[in-house]
Design a protein with these regions (language model features):
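C-terminal helical "lid" subdomain and adjoining coupling/linker elements of P-loop NTPases
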Residues: 1-105, 119-126, 135-141, 160
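Active-site lining segments that contact anionic ligands and/or coordinate catalytic metals
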Residues: 11, 108-110, 156, 165
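Short alpha-helical scaffolding segments that buttress acidic/His motifs in well-ordered protein cores
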Residues: 24, 109-114
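Extended, regular secondary-structure scaffolds
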Residues: 129-132, 136-151, 156
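A short, conserved structural fragment
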Residues: 151-167
Length: 171
């Protein structure tokens, strides 16, 4: 997403990045289109739930200083809606959780791929997944770690993750 990013916008939006709002709005739109909007929360309510830790995520006040919201945060917050509206994608994430029960990284990658696949308006590339999973302002790049985990998932016949036209996709 081509969102403005300045010191002021970061300060005003923390722990979210400008792109998160575009992602959230498009994700809510995709969920509404699939479910007819029944039972969906507003973007403001989802953000409040993330900040207060009411939808399954840890409250922002309980996070370390510098923590950033990610696509994983949004998936976790909207998991019930995703399960109802995009059953096959939700089940694919579940298969990753079964195959890699002790790896939060693999599970988080699956959640990020799921969000991007649902959106359908942003390439589901390794770089985008890595960027949208960046956990804190002080964290170094996770590109190589994520690349290794993605390769493990692609090479596991029980994980329905593949590549199509340079994008990661749940099959």
């Amino acid at each position: 997403y081509d969102a403005d990013f300045s010191r002021e916008s970061f300060t005003n939006l923390y722990p979210f990045l400008p792109a998160h709002f575009d992602i959230l709005l498009h994700l809510l739109g995709a969920l509404a289109k699939s479910t007819g909007g029944i039972g969906l929360r507003s973007a403001i309510k989802v953000i409040q739930d993330v900040l207060k830790g009411e939808g399954g995520s840890k409250a922002m006040a309980d996070q370390p200083v510098g923590w950033l919201a990610t696509t994983v945060t949004l998936y976790d917050e909207l998991e019930k809606d995703i399960r109802r509206a995009f059953t096959s994608i939700h089940q694919a994430v579940g298969k990753v959780q079964i195959r890699f029960p002790d790896s939060q990284l693999h599970q988080d990658i699956a959640k990020s791929v799921a969000v991007l696949q649902i959106l359908g308006n942003l390439p589901v590339t390794l770089q985008n997944v890595t960027s949208l999973m960046h956990p804190s302002v002080t964290a170094s790049s996770q590109l190589e770690t994520i690349r290794k985990a993605v390769d493990e998932m692609l090479n596991d016949v029980h994980v329905p993750l593949g590549e199509k036209d340079g994008n990661l996709v749940f099959l």
